[in-house]
Regions:
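Conserved PLP-enzyme active-site core in the AAT-like
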Residues: 1-157, 161-187, 192-207, 215-223
Length: 225
């Protein structure tokens, strides 16, 4: 929160991400979010939650998503990540807030025509995909256990918290990161690059038990030979 100083922009909003991507998919508790919400109110600020994967956070903690969202003034969540819809996100807030957001969207030209078919997919996601997120988390644990046994991989302590695995690549591995990613892709495994020698793997509906084993074997082939 910036001080009241003419050279700085005025702080109006605190934004939290749940789950937190760059921290390895860790989920924020309702108590933590409520403490931040209280701080925001004391300072006359609003609290927004980027809840792209809030249902993963809820699944990890065994609580309804609304419990994690309640302390925030506004929340967004993604339909196309863990919930596996083809596209879409949802903005949540008070009626007055949504009314203003709708007007702002119109002003910016962000409306879509005949988007009902996308909404239908989102409804299916909310009705059928939430309860199975724990399966992704379980597979992430199995994948992490398999990767931990491969020389040259340096998994973050505590990972995975939810459905994401972050791992470093030891300097003892001669290949550079892009070469490793390319070889994995040739073996049918796609991973993200989040740093010079750092990878991210995300578990989702389309990764089954066979996919977990395939990923472990692909890493062994690329890094160990």
């Amino acid at each position: 929160i910036r001080p009241d100083e003419a050279h700085h922009p005025v702080t109006r909003l605190i934004a939290l991400e749940n789950t937190h991507n760059r921290c390895g998919g860790v989920s924020l508790t309702a108590n933590y979010t409520r403490a931040v919400s209280n701080l925001a109110k004391e300072c006359g600020l609003l609290l927004h939650m980027d809840g792209a994967r809030i249902f993963n956070a809820a699944a990890a903690q065994g609580v309804p998503a609304r419990v994690l969202a309640e302390p925030a003034d506004s929340v967004t969540f993604c339909l196309s990540k863990g919930l596996c819809a083809p596209v879409g996100s949802v903005l949540c807030g008070s009626k007055a807030f949504i009314r203003q957001a709708h007007r702002t969207r119109k002003q910016l030209g962000g409306g879509m025509r005949q988007a009902g078919i996308l909404a239908a997919a989102g409804i299916v996601a909310l009705e059928t995909m939430v309860d199975r997120l724990v399966d992704d988390h379980a597979r992430a644990k199995r994948l992490a256990k398999g990767l931990q046994g491969i020389s040259g991989l340096e998994l973050d302590p505590g990972t995975p918290y939810t459905n994401m695995i972050f791992t470093g690549i030891s300097e003892q591995i001669p290949q550079d990161t892009r070469e490793i990613v390319t070889r994995l892709a040739e073996l049918g495994v796609r991973v993200g690059v989040t740093g010079k020698r750092r990878l991210r793997l995300v578990l989702h509906y389309w990764i089954d038990d066979a996919g977990v084993e395939k990923t472990i074997q692909a890493f062994k082939e690329v890094l160990v030979g």
